[in-house]
């Protein structure tokens, strides 16, 4: 399975083509749109999300509600394009029109792709960089992940997410499955503990009032994963390596860990390794899950726990120092409409990126052209965990 996205932040649309989805999966566009709506929410979001009404149109690969096994194409319209039609249109414009453009960018933002991207592709107007490097592209990635979540549901695999930390204010590291699921989306910062939600909102408001931004930590959990997905044989087939690459490819994500993560460095091995137990009904399992469901680059049947670190968004309303690439003079960086905190929305993006990586790994492990074939192979692998 693979996908390719196209489109600019203020262009007419985002387009994504997904290849390798098995045939005969029932797809309802409202299920995908429900996930798209979640991405637009969260405390700290900017005005852009008040303009956009992200919905998906499926234009290929699905017939009468079922996947065909051929490439699936989805389109997300950018409603804000109506305000950018001349500036972001494909049609040529005159030099006079170009000179009169008010949205040409020559003052790169620290922490963004602006300057290095301009150098790499020889763009003197850095809008050509920021339009594609914008996190707006994650709308297309959420559409892909939503499609993958439908596939995972067919295999009785659950995936969900939450916010663990915003601006140094932390929720608990771990919750049991029942508590986690029962409290999803209970507040607009996506934390389980309501008592710290207001403290997070206050922290976001403080950053916004100061023209600043804040980051945080999100967590994704995958439950009922069959054992042995991934491989210890080669580095590029390790499941945790694939998930890690997917997570750090999300805009502004600067770190990833699994289970206890970096805290494992503080403890002895006897407190980190998960003891192996056996039950005749469920087979092998672990007495704990410090390693986050992954051993030797493979799933071990325990919940996969992924933690992602998001830095503060680099667009600041109190801009940092920069340099105009035309005059080489010192200037404050460009101010572009942005969020003060996108961590709650980023937890949704991370969930869907992980969903894609899990679905992709399953289809690599169990080469299947249709969902019935895939289901049978998953049943057999789960039985192996009991009979081995």
From Swiss-Prot:
Enzyme nomenclature, EC number: 4.2.3.5
Signal peptide segment: none
SUPFAM superfamilies the UniProt entry points to: Chorismate synthase, AroC
Keywords from the named record: Amino-acid biosynthesis, Aromatic amino acid biosynthesis, FAD, Flavoprotein, FMN, Lyase, NADP
CDD domains: Chorismate_synthase
Residues the entry annotates as binding FMN: 132-134, 251-252, 296, 311-315, 337
Cofactor(s) the protein requires to work: FMNH2
UniProt key word Transit peptide: no
Oligomeric form and interacting partners: Homotetramer.
Function, as annotated: This reaction introduces a second double bond into the aromatic ring system.
Name of the protein described by the UniProt record: Chorismate synthase
Gene name tied to this protein: aroC
């Amino acid at each position: 399975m693979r996908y390719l996205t196209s489109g600019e932040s203020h262009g007419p649309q985002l387009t994504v083509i997904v290849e390798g989805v098995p045939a005969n999966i029932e797809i309802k566009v409202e299920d995908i749109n429900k996930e798209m709506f979640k991405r637009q929410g969260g405390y700290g979001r900017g005005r852009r999300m008040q303009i956009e009404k992200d919905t998906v149109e499926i234009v290929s690969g699905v017939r009468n509600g079922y996947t065909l096994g051929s490439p699936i194409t989805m389109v997300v319209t950018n409603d804000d394009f109506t305000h950018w039609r001349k500036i972001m249109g494909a049609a040529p414009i005159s030099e006079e029109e170009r000179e009169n453009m008010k949205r040409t960018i020559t003052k790169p933002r620290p922490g963004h792709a602006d300057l290095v991207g301009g150098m790499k592709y020889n763009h003197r107007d850095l809008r050509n960089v920021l339009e594609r490097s914008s996190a707006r592209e994650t709308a297309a990635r959420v559409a892909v992940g939503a499609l993958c979540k439908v596939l995972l549901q067919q295999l009785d695999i659950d995936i969900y997410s939450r916010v663990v930390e915003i601006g140094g204010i932390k929720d608990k590291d771990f919750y049991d499955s029942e508590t986690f699921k029962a409290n999803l989306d209970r507040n607009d910062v996506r934390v389980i503990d309501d008592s710290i939600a207001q403290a997070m909102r206050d922290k976001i408001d403080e950053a916004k009032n100061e023209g600043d931004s804040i980051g945080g930590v999100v967590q994704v959990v995958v439950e009922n994963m069959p054992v042995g997905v991934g491989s210890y044989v080669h580095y590029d087939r390790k499941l945790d390596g694939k998930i890690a690459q997917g997570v750090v490819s999300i805009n502004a994500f600067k770190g990833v860990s699994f289970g206890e993560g970096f805290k494992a460095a503080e403890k002895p091995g006897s407190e980190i390794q998960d003891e192996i137990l056996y039950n005749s009904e469920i087979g092998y399992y672990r007495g704990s899950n410090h390693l986050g469901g992954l051993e030797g680059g493979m799933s071990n049947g325990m919940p996969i726990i992924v933690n992602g670190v998001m830095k503060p968004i680099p667009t600041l309303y109190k801009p940092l120092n920069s340099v105009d690439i035309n005059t080489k003079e010192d200037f404050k960086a460009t101010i572009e409409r942005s969020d003060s905190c996108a961590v709650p929305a980023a937890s949704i993006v991370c969930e869907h990126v992980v969903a894609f990586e899990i679905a992709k790994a399953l289809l690599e492990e169990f080469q299947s052209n249709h969902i019935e074939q895939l289901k049978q192979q998953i049943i057999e692998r789960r039985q192996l965990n009991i009979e081995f």
